[in-house]
Curated annotation (Swiss-Prot):
Descriptive protein name: Ubiquinone/menaquinone biosynthesis C-methyltransferase UbiE
GO MF annotations, alphabetized: 2-methoxy-6-polyprenyl-1,4-benzoquinol methyltransferase activity; demethylmenaquinone methyltransferase activity
Residues annotated as binding S-adenosyl-L-methionine: 82, 103, 131-132, 148
E.C. number(s) listed in UniProt: 2.1.1.163, 2.1.1.201
Annotated metabolic or biological route of this protein: Quinol/quinone metabolism; menaquinone biosynthesis; menaquinol from 1,4-dihydroxy-2-naphthoate: step 2/2; Cofactor biosynthesis; ubiquinone biosynthesis
Cross-referenced Pfam families: Ubie_methyltran
Enzyme type, top EC level: transferase
Family from the record: Belongs to the class I-like SAM-binding methyltransferase superfamily. MenG/UbiE family.
PROSITE patterns: SAM_MT_UBIE, UBIE_1, UBIE_2
Catalysed reactions listed for this entry: a 2-demethylmenaquinol + S-adenosyl-L-methionine = a menaquinol + S-adenosyl-L-homocysteine + H(+); a 2-methoxy-6-(all-trans-polyprenyl)benzene-1,4-diol + S-adenosyl-L-methionine = a 5-methoxy-2-methyl-3-(all-trans-polyprenyl)benzene-1,4-diol + S-adenosyl-L-homocysteine + H(+)
Keyword Transcription regulation: no
Length: 259
């Protein structure tokens, strides 16, 4: 292979990424992911309960417990969607604290805003439409950042992690809650069957959208495994990194600090 061919292939790789199992231009992924979440926003909470049997609430509770959130702190719930974590953080930080619910998708953000306001959660929560790769916040601003079931949808994950590191205060912590790789082979086989066959059918029946939930299954398989993601966090500058496998590694919570 010539140097010119190598350069051409490298340039192509730099301009493309994965949307599920499909290779697409980076700009196209942003559009396609947006379409997925515009489509599922209204049924997002219902589908989360159905898909996980409600276990997602335990995963999120563990994330809150590991956050170390305290009254008066500033917290960023990035890719916070319908606001499950924001609701909990709002109560913890109190009137002197501040929670930002940020999401790139305005449909998800609107659903989250409406849900939280309907539940009387106002005053210390602000809503920002933002791209995780280019966060519109000052340096060293947040005490805690969480990103829950969102990172796998981000086009440039390394850039997003660097952006999170920038806006986190020294001494602050990042928590990444995301689908991961099952650690037990029998569980992995059952999980594959469930993900690729039952999830799209559930999506079709409940949300009238099988394709978005097929993408969900594919995006999980393309997401970095536990060790790889921990390494990416370290490359972005995070220290004292650690991850916890939840439900046999179907989900993992990664934690890292900025010092």
């Amino acid at each position: 292979m010539t140097d010119t061919s190598l350069q051409s292939n490298t340039a192509l790789e730099n301009e493309t990424t994965h949307f599920g199992f499909t290779t697409v231009a980076k700009e196209e992924k942003v559009t396609k992911v947006a379409e997925v979440f515009h489509s599922v926003a209204a049924k997002y909470d219902i589908m989360n309960d159905l898909m996980s049997g409600g276990i997602h609430r335990l995963w999120k509770r563990f994330t809150i417990d590991c956050s170390g959130a305290r009254p008066g702190q500033r917290i960023l719930d990035l890719g916070g969607g319908t606001g499950d974590l924001t609701a909990k953080f709002s109560r913890i930080v109190g009137d002197q604290g501040h929670v930002v619910l940020a999401d790139i998708n305005n449909s998800m953000l609107n659903v989250g805003r409406d849900k939280l306001r309907d539940n009387g959660i106002v005053g210390n929560v602000h809503y920002v439409q933002a791209n995780a790769e280019e966060l519109p916040f000052p340096d060293d601003y947040f005490d805690v950042i969480t990103i829950s079931f969102c990172l796998r949808n981000v086009t440039d994950k390394d850039k997003a992690l660097r952006s999170m590191f920038r806006v986190l205060k020294p001494g602050g912590r990042l928590l990444v809650l995301e689908f991961s790789k099952p650690v037990l082979e029998p569980l992995s086989k059952v999980y594959d069957a469930y993900s690729f066959h039952l999830l799209p059918k559930m999506g079709e029946l409940v949300a009238n959208d099988a394709e978005s939930y097929r993408y969900l299954a594919e995006s999980i398989r393309m997401h970095p495994d536990q060790e790889t993601l921990e390494g990416m966090m370290q490359d972005a500058g995070f220290e004292n990194t650690k991850y916890y496998n939840l439900t046999g590694g179907i989900v993992a919570l990664h934690r890292g600090y900025k010092f």
